[in-house]
UniProtKB/Swiss-Prot annotation:
Principal cellular location given in the protein's record: membrane
Localization in the cell: Membrane
Topological relation to the membrane, as annotated: Multi-pass membrane protein
Chain ranges passing through the membrane: 9-29, 43-63, 76-96, 106-126, 140-160, 163-183, 193-213, 229-249, 257-276, 280-302
Entry similarity comment: Belongs to the TPT transporter family. TPT (TC 2.A.7.9) subfamily.
Keyword Oxidoreductase: no
InterPro entries, per the entry: Sugar_P_trans_dom, TPT_transporter
GO cellular component labels: endosome; Golgi apparatus; membrane; trans-Golgi network
Organism the protein comes from: Arabidopsis thaliana (Mouse-ear cress)
Coiled coil: none
This protein's name: Probable sugar phosphate/phosphate translocator At1g48230
Amino acid sequence: MAKMINKTLVLTYIYLLIYIILSSGVILYNKWVLSPKYFNFPLPITLTMIHMGFSGFVAFLLIRVFKVVSPVKMTFEIYVTCVVPISAFFASSLWFGNTAYLHISVAFIQMLKALMPVATFLMAVVCGTDKARCDVFMNMVLVSVGVVVSSYGEINFNVIGTVYQVMGIFAEALRLVLTQVLLQKKGLTLNPVTSLYYIAPCSFVFLSLPWYVLEKPNIDVSQIQFNFWIFFSNALCALALNFSIFLVIGRTGAVTIRVAGVLKDWILIALSTVIFPESTITGLNITGYAIALCGVVMYNYIKIKDVKAIQPTTDSLPDRITKDWKEKNSSDGGSPRGLELNDEEAPLITSRLSHIGRTQLGNHTAV
C-alpha cells in the first residue's frame, strides 16, 4: 500500500510539472508566433480559431469515430441557453488575451492576470453566486493596488494591450460565473472531451465574426508565413495543456494547485525576460506584483477555508489517494469538490464542467 501511495504521489508531481511546462510553453509559444519580431503571424483571432478547429476535430474523432468517449445527452434548449453564451465569453477571453501579446510583454501580462480573482469576485457578486464580504473586498483592493503599481512601473506600457488583457480577464471571469450559474441549474456534467466537442465549434463560429471584420480584410496571403508544423504543434500543445489540467485536478488538492499556479507565474515571468530580451522588468514591476500576489494568496486562503468549513473532513492527499484507490474511482470522479483550475491558455472549458452537477460550491481560482 505504501509503495502504491509513493508511486501515485510521484505521478502527481510529474503531472504538476507537465502542467507547469505546458502552461508556460503555450503562452511563450503563442507570443513567439504572434509577435512581429519573431514568427510574425500578427493574427490573434486566426490563431485562436486554429486552436478551436483543431480541438473540435480531435473531440469529434474521439467521440464519433473512435468512440473512446461516450457523448452526453445534449438538448437544443441546453445548448442554446448554456453552451452558446459560455462559448461566446470563452471565445472572447481567448481573442482578447491573444491580441494582448501583440502589444505588451508576457511578464506584464502575467502581472495583469493577478486581477483575475478581482474580476471573478465582482462578476460572482453581480450574478448573485457570491456575497460581498469585507475580508474578500480588502484583498481585492490589495490586488488592485499591486497591479496599478506594477503598471506604473512598466517601461513599455501600452494602453491598447493593457485594455485587451483586462477585457480578456473580465470575459473569462464572466465565463466562469456563467458556467456555474447556467450549467449547475441544468445539472449537466461534461468531461474535457465532451466539453471540447460542444464548446470548441461554437467558439469557432463566434470568432469567425470578428475575424471577418478585423482580420480578413488585412490578410495578405503573399506576406503571411504559414508553416503547417508550427501551427499543428502550437494547437497540439494547447490541447495537451487542457488534458494536463484535467489530470492535475484529478490527483491534487486546492492548496497544491494554487501553489503550482503561483510557481508557474514566477517561472513564466523569469523565462519571458530571457526568451524575449525586449521584456524589461523594473523594481516597481516586481514590487507591484508582490503586493498583488499577497492579495491573491490571502484570497485563496479564504476560499480554501470556506471549502474546509463546508467539508471539515477533507482527506489529506495520501489519504484521498488511498481512498480513491480502494474505491477504484475514475479520474473524473477523483476531482476535488469545489475546486476550479482555470488556465486562460487552455483551448476549452476546464474543470467546472467536469463536476458542475455535483457541487453547489463556487470557488474561483486565479492561475
